[in-house]
């Protein structure tokens, strides 16, 4: 099955291209960004060698849908989606922090808690919690935005301000937007029988100084979801929660001896496993959005994307 793991487009008035872990971003005339969601899969801050069919389309369509569903509370960078794998938006200067918000003790926070730590990113976590218990109120645990090949690192609000990574005035806006988006995401998830456990948001500034949401929102790559039905019973019985996230990929990697540490070999994914990951992503899409996933034509993905983007840029 065809996948798109790298692109090499040359659009009119193209100034530069930035290649992230999953997305490739083309700067058009220092005005627009054309963001292509590839089928690359990253875990533990490492890009895995194999692409996952339809993953880029799934992430792009979930993110753009949630941008539409939240634009009344938080402005965002998005202008158009000329292709299933592509979002076009305003050029922004990204803030160098990712705003992580957690409603439950899961993932990285749970691993820290299990080590006896009760503070994460300068935020105190209450005593007596079990993994996947709900926090009394959601906590914001920012990370520094790592360059490719580096690990994102936890950072406290006070350190962000002390190092002048973000001004206090801007940071208050980021915090408010983060809480508002998480609240809306929680409500939408509940309407689908899901719990939005934790998620991360990225923000940027437009040329005129407006703070906007950028990148992705409420996707399986940036968020963790649980099924709401049976959640409390599973907690009471100390059973694992049923998750909708890419945690299943992380688990598979850990079971196969890989956690992104130096010297560890990335395990090989056979075709059967790649297909199963693709199917899980489609399941995630349908559960999160509550609608059927329509597969795009992947016979020649690069050609399709190039044609659609060129058409959009010419008619703009």
From Swiss-Prot:
Protein origin, superkingdom: Bacteria
Keywords: ATP-binding, Ligase, Nucleotide-binding, Purine biosynthesis
Pfam families: SAICAR_synt
One Gene Ontology CC term in the entry: cytoplasm
Annotated TM spans: none
One Gene Ontology molecular-function label: ATP binding
Entry-linked PANTHER family: PHOSPHORIBOSYLAMINOIMIDAZOLE-SUCCINOCARBOXAMIDE SYNTHASE (PTHR43700:SF1)
Family: Belongs to the SAICAR synthetase family.
Protein name listed in UniProt: Phosphoribosylaminoimidazole-succinocarboxamide synthase
């Amino acid at each position: 099955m065809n996948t798109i793991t790298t692109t090499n487009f040359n659009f009119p008035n193209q100034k530069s291209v930035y290649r992230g872990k999953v997305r490739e971003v083309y700067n058009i005339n220092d005005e627009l960004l054309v963001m292509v969601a590839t089928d690359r899969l990253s875990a533990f801050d490492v890009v895995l060698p194999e692409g996952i069919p339809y993953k880029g389309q799934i992430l792009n369509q979930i993110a753009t849908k949630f941008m539409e569903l939240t634009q009344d509370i938080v402005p965002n960078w998005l202008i158009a989606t000329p292709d299933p794998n592509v979002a076009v938006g305003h050029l922004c200067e990204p803030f160098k922090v990712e705003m992580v918000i957690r409603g439950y003790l899961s993932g990285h926070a749970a691993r820290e808690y299990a080590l006896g730590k009760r503070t994460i990113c300068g935020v105190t976590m209450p005593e007596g919690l079990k993994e996947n218990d709900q926090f009394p109120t959601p906590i914001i645990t920012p990370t520094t935005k790592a360059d490719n090949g580096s690990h994102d690192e936890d950072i406290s609000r006070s350190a962000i301000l002390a190092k002048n990574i973000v001004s206090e005035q801007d940071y208050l806006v980021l915090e408010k937007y983060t809480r508002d988006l998480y609240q809306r995401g929680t409500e939408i998830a509940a309407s689908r029988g899901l719990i939005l456990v934790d998620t991360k948001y990225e923000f940027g500034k437009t040329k005129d100084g407006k703070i906007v949401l950028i990148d992705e929102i409420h996707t399986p790559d940036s968020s963790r979801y649980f099924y709401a039905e049976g959640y409390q019973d599973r907690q009471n019985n100390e059973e694992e929660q049923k998750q909708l996230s890419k945690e299943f990929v992380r688990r598979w990697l850990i079971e196969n001896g890989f956690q992104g540490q130096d010297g560890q070999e990335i395990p090989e994914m056979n075709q059967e496993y790649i297909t199963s990951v693709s199917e899980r992503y489609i399941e995630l899409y349908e559960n999160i959005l509550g609608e059927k996933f329509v597969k795009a034509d992947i016979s020649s993905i690069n050609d399709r994307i190039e044609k659609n983007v060129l058409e959009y840029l010419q008619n703009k």
